[in-house]
Amino acid sequence: MNTCITCGMPFTGEHENEIGMETSYGPVCIHDCEDGDIKEPEDIFAGGVAYFVDNVTDGDFDLAERLTRRNMLSLEYWQENPFEELEGPVASESEYAEAMAKL
């Protein structure tokens, strides 16, 4: 499955045509790039937190941050390009599985 290298969004269904740019790592979604560049990692992290708050955690900001960290740390791009917000607590396996089941 083709997914965004910065957030993991699958390019299927309603997101099928949301590739914003291609990089040597792979595709980046339209939400995580601007003017031909990948957005700042802090902005992508904030977008991930907002997504989880709105769609999964019923407003639990702390859980949304932990889910975002776990998600981003699972992606090769962030393993090779770490940044400060990735340091901190991550969601447990069960928290992450429960969150993904809601999507």
PLM features per residue range, with description:
Residues 2-5, 101-103:
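N-terminal pre-domain and mature-chain start segments
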Residues 7-17:
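Short Cys/His-rich Zn2+-coordinating modules
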Residues 4-7, 29-32:
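Short cysteine-rich clusters marking metal-coordination/redox-active sites
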